[in-house]
């Protein structure tokens, strides 16, 4: 096998593919990359993730009479996801496979901004009737502020670090997973709602695929916890992941924010909460009761003015149809659901809980609610 190809663009980016012979091994296949702007390539696909950064690296694949092996070093400078900075990412990986393709060995290290955050060591054995894996993964002070870039919009930002270690053993299709995860000074903040929860620093054990929560605490702004007990079983297929979790909290301050910028919700909010989630991922039972306590004083700001809300409000409110006109019948809009979810929830507002609603961002039009009541909601599937 021989190759010699070089592609460059105005001296800024380079793609090079070539072979060489060093006298010891058969021809090796080499690849070099430099100055590749990811956004210029990913824009070619409408399904590509919103990743940006400058890609560079090199890779080599080689073989002899006993092994095929390869190693690569890849770097993405100023990597971002959805316009949120992740950092400078480095991946160093090595892979080897026996000539009969019965055993594969892997080793990988990942760094973020020059600090090691993850390692992988393992092998796969295909010489048995069912493929067996032996894999060790370690997470070392992964900065959650950078990982927040991958969270969906509206879920807030995280701070602190994540540590962990996992061992995967047994059949490749359904390995046994054991290890633990541990947050270090971690907090989840949703700035637009003045909400913050601090994660417990204790280990979260994973035993045979079960992620266990033993009185695990998420603390509100006043230090009072929401306590989780139960487990999530990851030992099955994705749609068969089974959960059995109960959560309970008393006088937890879930909102503690000040009026500023385009914040939608601010003030102080205190709740009692009881909840439970049980069942498979595609067939869940959820129960929850949330009491908004006295002492709560919240202000919600409509970011759209009341004038804009009323414009066109009378359009499409009433539509007259002729039921005998079969030519205008539309197809059923109710598609079969891939999963079922049963929900039973109650929201209780206690006396002396105050709510203010600013109908315009400047606060000139507003409503104040000082009352009590209960709202129930249920869903069968």
Residue ranges of model-derived segments:
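Interface amphipathic segments
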Residues: 1-165, 173-273, 280-374, 380-381
């Amino acid at each position: 096998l021989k190759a010699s190809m070089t592609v460059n663009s105005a001296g800024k980016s380079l793609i090079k593919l070539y072979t060489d012979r060093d006298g010891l091994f058969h021809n090796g296949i080499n690849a070099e990359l430099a100055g590749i702007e990811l956004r210029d390539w990913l824009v070619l696909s409408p399904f590509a993730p919103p990743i940006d950064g400058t890609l560079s690296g090199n890779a080599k694949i080689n073989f002899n009479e006993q092994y095929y092996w390869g190693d690569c070093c890849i770097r993405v400078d100023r990597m971002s996801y959805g316009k949120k900075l992740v950092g400078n990412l480095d991946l160093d990986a090595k892979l080897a496979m026996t000539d009969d393709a019965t055993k594969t060995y892997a080793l990988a290290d990942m760094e973020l901004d020059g600090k090691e955050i993850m390692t992988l060591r393992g092998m796969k054995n295909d010489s048995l009737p069912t493929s067996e894996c032996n894999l060790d993964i370690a997470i070392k002070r992964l900065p959650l502020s950078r990982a927040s870039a991958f969270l969906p919009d509206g879920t807030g930002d995280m701070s602190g670090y994540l540590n962990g270690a996992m061992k995967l053993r047994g059949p490749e299709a359904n390995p046994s997973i054991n290890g633990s995860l541990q947050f270090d000074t971690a907090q989840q903040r949703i700035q637009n709602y003045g909400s913050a929860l601090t994660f417990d620093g204790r280990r979260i054990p994973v035993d045979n695929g079960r992620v266990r929560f033993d009185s695990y605490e998420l603390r509100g702004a006043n230090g009072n916890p929401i306590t989780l007990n139960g487990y999530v079983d990851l030992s099955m297929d994705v749609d068969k992941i089974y959960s059995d979790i109960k959560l309970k909290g008393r006088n937890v301050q879930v909102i503690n924010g000040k009026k500023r910028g385009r914040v939608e919700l601010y003030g102080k909010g205190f709740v009692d909460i009881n909840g439970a989630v049980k069942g498979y991922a595609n067939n869940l039972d959820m129960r929850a009761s949330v009491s908004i306590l006295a002492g709560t004083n919240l202000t919600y700001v409509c970011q759209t003015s009341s004038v804009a809300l009323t414009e066109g409000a009378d359009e499409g409110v009433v539509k007259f149809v002729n039921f005998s006109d079969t030519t205008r019948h539309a197809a059923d809009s109710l598609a079969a659901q891939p999963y079922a979810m049963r929900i039973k929830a109650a929201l209780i507002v206690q006396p002396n809980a105050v709510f203010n609603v600013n109908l315009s961002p400047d606060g000139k039009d507003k409503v104040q609610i000082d009352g009590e009541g209960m709202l129930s909601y249920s869903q069968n599937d």
